[in-house]
Amino acid sequence: MVIADASTKLLGRARWLAWATIVYNMIEAVVAIVAGSAAGSIALIGFGLDSIVEVLSAIVIVWQLNGVSEDRERTALKLIALSFYLLACYVAVQALFDLIGQTKPDTSLVGIGLAIASVIVMPILARAKRHTGKQLGSSTVVADSNQTKLCAYISIILLGGLIFNATIGWWWADPIAALVIAALAINEGRQAWKGETCTDSC
């Protein structure tokens, strides 16, 4: 009885962390896309689009925790994988156009603030998910913690690109950061296509 109660409590915590990630990523996506469009920053826009796909991926995690059928889960993961691939193609092509055309994005203080917030929040969420997943014995929750950790890395890349552009005028740092985000999105898509959210290789 005690073990069952502890397991139920841990499962509830895992669900809460998944929903917290969904809500944060939704806010992150809106702010990033609006700020990116205003500043002409493809890195910020790509970051926002990645956050949207991350929301879909997190919803699959919630489904898994609620015992959704494997067939529905596999279908959802395939669609998420395709979304990551489309995102990567769009961001990569736009970043290359910006590099070739030497399109200089404006400084985005909102974008820098968002990136700093994500660099702080994502590692905290990742650690909490990993700890909960290990206690629960759930590879799904542990894998999701790796996905969240990857989001923190993407946030660091975004922050670097935005700061370099704002402080020393390295306009090309923005599209370069966008290309790195596109490459990471391809990796996320590959993992989702294989039926994973992210593996321990992240």
Language model region names:
Residues 1-202:
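Alpha-helical transmembrane cores and adjacent cytosolic helix/loop segments
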